[in-house]
Amino acid sequence: MKDFFLFLGKFFKHGTAIASLAPSSPWLSRTTVRNIPWENARVVVELGAGTGPITKVIADRVHPDCRVIVLERDPDFARLLRERFANRANFDVVEGDVRDLTQILQQRGIEQADFVVSGLPVPSFPKELQRDLFRVVKQVLAPSGTFNQITEMPWVYQRFYRRFFDEVTFVFEPRNLPPAGAYFCRGVKESF
């Protein structure tokens, strides 16, 4: 319940900079990472982790040799995530901006990520920030990698993500309140 009130307070203070009124449910969190073959994943990046419900699912499933980079801009959320996942040697919680992701990974000796999991409210971003985000994703995502994006607006943004990716699928999760889902996007387009 503490996470809910922290999240709600951030939402009212920062509006659409916070993706939701509340943290993702366990069902939505599992749906968002359901396509990841955990035994083969080498690098997973999570953007906008908030209080960490998706991060927890990643922690429960990832093997110890897989590097997990969690990027969170909000200092309170980043501090909370560092505390929650301090015992995970393969986890690195970074307080920072998504536009700096390439440098953040390079500083850690990482060239590419197998999966980028996003809890960011991307469609609410200004157009230039959207383009910046997907330029960075194009730089860091392995050619066979997937960009996983959670949404509380089921199916509404299919066309939006198709502007940036060759292949976009959507999985609905009705048990989340409000009903939500995840987009699974592959093949970042050359230009957008």
Swiss-Prot record:
Its EC number is 2.1.1.344. NCBIfam families: ornithlipidmtase_OlsG. Gene3D superfamilies: Vaccinia Virus protein VP39. InterPro entries: Methyltransf_25 (IPR041698), Ornithlipidmtase_OlsG (IPR048196), rRNA_Ade_Mease_Trfase_CS (IPR020596), rRNA_Ade_methylase_Trfase_N (IPR020598), SAM-dependent_MTases_sf (IPR029063). It comes from the Bacteria. Keywords: Methyltransferase, S-adenosyl-L-methionine, Transferase. The lineage of its organism: Bacteria, Pseudomonadati, Planctomycetota, Planctomycetia, Isosphaerales. One of its GO terms (molecular function) is rRNA (adenine-N6,N6-)-dimethyltransferase activity. The keyword Transcription regulation does not apply. It comes from Singulisphaera acidiphila (strain ATCC BAA-1392 / DSM 18658 / VKM B-2454 / MOB10). Catalyzes the 3-fold methylation of ornithine lipids. Forms ornithine lipids that are mono-, di-, and trimethylated on the delta-nitrogen of the ornithine head group. This is Ornithine lipid N-methyltransferase. Belongs to the methyltransferase superfamily. It catalyses: an N(2)-[(3R)-3-(2-saturated-acyloxy)acyl]-L-ornithine lipid + 3 S-adenosyl-L-methionine = an N,N,N-trimethylornithine lipid + 3 S-adenosyl-L-homocysteine + 3 H(+).
